[in-house]
Amino acid sequence: MRTHYCGHVSETDLDQEVTLCGWAHRRRDHGGVIFIDLRDREGLVQVVFDPDRPETFALAERVRSEFVLKVRGRVRRRPAGTENPDLPTGQVEVLGLELDLLNPAKTPPFQLDEHEQAGEDVRLRYRYVDLRRPEMLQRLRARARITSNLRRFLDEHGFLDIETPMLTRATPEGARDYLVPSRTHPGSFFALPQSPQLFKQLLMMAGMDRYYQIVRCFRDEDLRADRQPEFTQLDIETSFMDEEGIMHLTERMMRRLFADVLQVDLPDPFPRMGYAEAMARFGSDKPDLRIPLELVEVADLMGGVEFKVFAGPAADPRGRVAALHVPGGAGLTRKQIDDYTQFVGRYGAKGLAYIKVNDPAQGREGLQSPILKFLTDEAVDGILRRTEARAGDLIFFGADKAKVVNDALGALRVKLGHDLAMVEDEWRPLWVVDFPMFEYDEKDGRLYALHHPFTAPNVDDPAELADKDPEQLVSRAYDMVLNGTELGGGSVRIHRQDMQQAVFRLLGIDEDEARAKFGFLLDALEYGAPPHGGIAFGLDRLVMLMTGASSIREVMAFPKTQTAACLLTDAPAEVDIAQLQELALRITKPQA
C-alpha cells in the first residue's frame, strides 16, 4: 500500500512520487491550502492539499485528528522560511495528488500532544491511542532493541534459548502465586511461575550447560512504581561456572548493551560492596551511589545516655542508632522536617530526631535540637566528629530495630538526595555480594531465605551449617545494582541433596514437607547434578532506567494498574457460572 514511511521522506526523494499511509496527526487550513501532518511509526511528514485538485481537496477538508489515510503525492522542498529544523522531514513536504480516507476516527479521549493533562487511568483505558505517542513508540522500540542486543550476546556465548512451563505447581516461598484451577483434576490447581528457578536448575542437571530465556513471570503482590503482577525477566543459568565467572560474563553483557544502545561506557570492572557495608553506609542493599549521603553508626556513643529512644536500641542486639549527615541541611524549615518525619513513618520509624549545626566550634551553644538536653557531651562530640558536620549542616537520627532504621534512613537518604538536587548525573553500577543466607522475621519468629532456599551457602560441608549461627551464614549470592535499582539477582545454587536438605531443615521445612513440595528436585540432585548458578534480570526495570521512564508501566505495552487491573479489557472479571461448575469451583464472597 505504501512506498515510504512518513518519517523516512527526505531530500533524496525530491520530485519523486511517494505513497504514504498513516494517521492524521494535525490538520490546518491556511489561506485556502490544507496542511495535514501525517504520522506513522517512523515519524511525521507535512502533506499539502491545494484547491487545484477539487476532489482531493474536498476529501482533505473532511479529515480530522487520527483519521487513517493513504496519500499519493510528490515530494518537494518546503518554501524558504517554512522549514522545520526540529523535524527530521522538516526540509520537505508532500504535495497531495490523491487521498484515500481508509478509516475515520472518533475524537480521541485526549490530544496526543497534551497527554500529560490526561490521567493515567484514561491513558490505560485507551492504551491503543496512548501508544501512538512518539515517546511511547520510542520506549517500545528501545525495549525491542535492548532485548535483541541481550539475545545476540547470549547466543554468541553459547547459551540456548529454552522455554519452561507456564503451568506449574505452587511454591511455598516468596510472594503469593496466581492459581489456575485444573478442569481435569478437580480441586487441584496449577500456579503461574514466579520465576523459572527450579526448571532452569533442572535444565543444568539435564546437561544443557548454558540456558537463557526472556520469560514472563507472575507474582500476586502489592504493587509499586517498579512492580507489576506480570513482568518480564532475562533468566540465565550456567553449569561449571562459579560466581566470579557469572559476574564477569553478565558485566560484559551490560557494558556492551549500554555502549550499543546509549553510547555509555560503564566501568570495567563494576565495583563491589559487601551486604553488611551497604546496609551500614546506605541503609539499603541496592544503594544509589550517585547520592553523596551516608549513614554513620553512633550506637556505641550512647553508653552514658539515659534517653531511652537512643539507649534502648543501642543496647539491643537487633537494634541500631544511626546518623544521616546532610550538608547544608540546617536551612530546612520546621515544616520540611515535619514532612520528612511523616515520610519515615511509612517505614516504621516512630520519629525523626535531628541536630542543626550552626557553629560546631561553640560546642552545644552552636547546636540547635530538641534532643540536645538528653545527650552527654561525649555523645555530642562523638557525633560531630564522626559525621564531620560543619556549620550549616543538619544531622538526622534513626533509633529502632536495625531493619526499621535501615529502611527509614535509607529511604530518607534517597529522598533528600533528590529533593536537594544532590543526585549526580551518571551511571553507577555496583555488585552487592556476601549476602546473609537467612533473615529473621520478628513477626513470625522464624528464619526465611534472603534470596531463595536453593541458594548455596559459603560452606562446603552440610555439617558446618549445624555448627554455625544461621544468621551469621553467608550465601554465594550477588545482586547487580544500578543507580539504586536492583537490575538482577543471582547466586550459585545448591547442587548436592544433603546440602539442600540441611538448608530446608534450617528453614523449618521437615523431610516430609520437603519431599511433598520439592521431591522432584531432591530426586534430580541424586542423578549427577553439576555445580551451577545463574542470575535473573528484571527487563522492565532495565528498560525503565535506560529510557528514563518514571515507572515500568511506561515501558510495557499493556500494563496493569496499581490495583492489578487492566482498564483496557476490564480484567479481572467475573466468569459464567457454567465455567465455575465445570471447574468444580464455587465463589464465596468475602464478608464485609
Curated annotation (Swiss-Prot):
- What is this protein's function per UniProt? Aspartyl-tRNA synthetase with relaxed tRNA specificity since it is able to aspartylate not only its cognate tRNA(Asp) but also tRNA(Asn). Reaction proceeds in two steps: L-aspartate is first activated by ATP to form Asp-AMP and then transferred to the acceptor end of tRNA(Asp/Asn).
The UniProt entry's GO CC annotations, sorted and at most eight, read: cytoplasm
Reaction catalysis annotation = tRNA(Asx) + L-aspartate + ATP = L-aspartyl-tRNA(Asx) + AMP + diphosphate
- State the compartments where it is located: Cytoplasm
Name of the protein this chain belongs to: Aspartate--tRNA(Asp/Asn) ligase
Q: Name one GO molecular function term.
A: aspartate-tRNA ligase activity
Sorted UniProt keywords: Aminoacyl-tRNA synthetase, ATP-binding, Cytoplasm, Ligase, Nucleotide-binding, Protein biosynthesis
Q: Where is this protein chiefly located? A: cytoplasm
GO biological process terms, alphabetically, are: aspartyl-tRNA aminoacylation
**Where does the entry annotate site (Important for tRNA non-discrimination)?**
H30, G81
Regarding protein family, the annotation reads: Belongs to the class-II aminoacyl-tRNA synthetase family. Type 1 subfamily.
Region ranges (Aspartate): 197-200
Gene field? aspS
Q: How does it assemble?
A: Homodimer.
Q: What is its EC number?
A: 6.1.1.23
List ligand-binding residues for ATP.
R219, D220, E221, Q228, E486, G538, L539, D540, R541
Q: Where does L-aspartate bind?
A: E173, R219, H451, R493
Kindly report, in one word, the top-level EC class recorded for this enzyme: ligase
